[in-house]
């Protein structure tokens, strides 16, 4: 199975988590760094091995400086479904492309990576020795080699049915590792200021990558909470700001979410979190504000809006308002006045969110947000839509047997011009999602049913 020598073909070794999020991340990042996604496989599916065509090694390295979904990247020299096919593929790879990394003044080592199977040391040595036909002239250096080469073997996805021989074998030159270490270094467990629903660090970086966040961008979170999403964007050099209706959260007051701590400390706030990671210079501000009544002037100024709206489960969905028929004008309220809040229906929340994004995003800017769904009733028609926004990706993360949340990425493709017309279109389109206004009740009804079933099974087991 020879590979065409004219193509810059690379092998991505992907992490086996958040599977649906991987392809949109890679596509988004390639478009940011000047590459275009062109695949060499019909489908990627759940496989950790992806073959891509990337224009240059510089673009490939820049991709790995951003991705948290990929573990490693290799310049692919050959691959096949058997050792014989691999060797034939390697022999057809242009020698002039190998020589710069195999000459006598170089040092190297060869590593073995297997997916879904463990090899003995003897089996590993046998595989390395079989590559003696390659023109290696340099010296082996296992500690600090100039070049690292890898044999990668794919034994499929089923741990209960591991084949004797691999489905695919790859050989390539290691280029770079991804940014998986960010998940640990930015872990919520180590963060100074956290809340009940602080976003997982890995997902925060995935959202920033889906949003194509880059240096000097202006990124906004209208449901900022404890600011976890701002941290990921600031890490990539974007200036960040946000709003939230909860005064205590914005100002770092009230009860703490951390175990064995009753009240928040004097310096527990979003700014302190960015300071913790050396990112304070990217912090603009966070404001107490109601997302249903944006206080921003008209215009397009956000490069990305990244947010995780409340679902009504661990954080309430609220907006300012009153049940009274006659409302007091805001100019008559004292500065210390705290407005009455009402329930903020999910369908209204997402209607306001995408309308706000369509109005304030720059052309080409992206909106990335989580949409909670009750899976037995979910259809793609429920995903919010706007004439000015194009749906880029829709990825599912399961929350329970009956609920999930979907990471929605949209890109602004048209200027916001006719708000009245948009309002009418959006109201009609949001009818399918209005049933999810009772998402909280459906979520807990499923939990109640599960507990009842478990108790019944336990009772029957004792009889």
Curated annotation (Swiss-Prot):
Family in the record: Belongs to the class I-like SAM-binding methyltransferase superfamily. TRM11 methyltransferase family.
Assembly behavior: Part of the heterodimeric TRMT11-TRM112 methyltransferase complex; this complex forms an active tRNA methyltransferase, where TRMT112 acts as an activator of the catalytic subunit TRMT11.
Subcellular localization(s) per the UniProt record: Cytoplasm
Pfam family, one: UPF0020
Name of the protein in its database record: tRNA (guanine(10)-N(2))-methyltransferase TRMT11
Reactions mediated catalytically: guanosine(10) in tRNA + S-adenosyl-L-methionine = N(2)-methylguanosine(10) in tRNA + S-adenosyl-L-homocysteine + H(+)
Enzyme Commission designation: 2.1.1.214
Keyword list, A-Z: Acetylation, Cytoplasm, Methyltransferase, RNA-binding, S-adenosyl-L-methionine, Transferase, tRNA processing, tRNA-binding
GO cellular component, one term: tRNA (m2G10) methyltransferase complex
Entry-annotated residues carrying N-acetylalanine: 2
Taxonomic lineage from the root: Eukaryota, Metazoa, Chordata, Craniata, Vertebrata
Any GO molecular function: tRNA (guanine(10)-N2)-methyltransferase activity
GO biological process, one term: methylation
Keyword Glycosyltransferase among UniProt keywords: no
Entry keyword annotation includes Acyltransferase: no
Function: Catalytic subunit of the TRMT11-TRM112 methyltransferase complex, that specifically mediates the S-adenosyl-L-methionine-dependent N(2)-methylation of guanosine nucleotide at position 10 (m2G10) in tRNAs. This is one of the major tRNA (guanine-N(2))-methyltransferases.
Stored InterPro entries: DNA_methylase_N6_adenine_CS, RlmKL-like_Mtase, SAM-dependent_MTases_sf, tRNA_mtfrase_TRM11
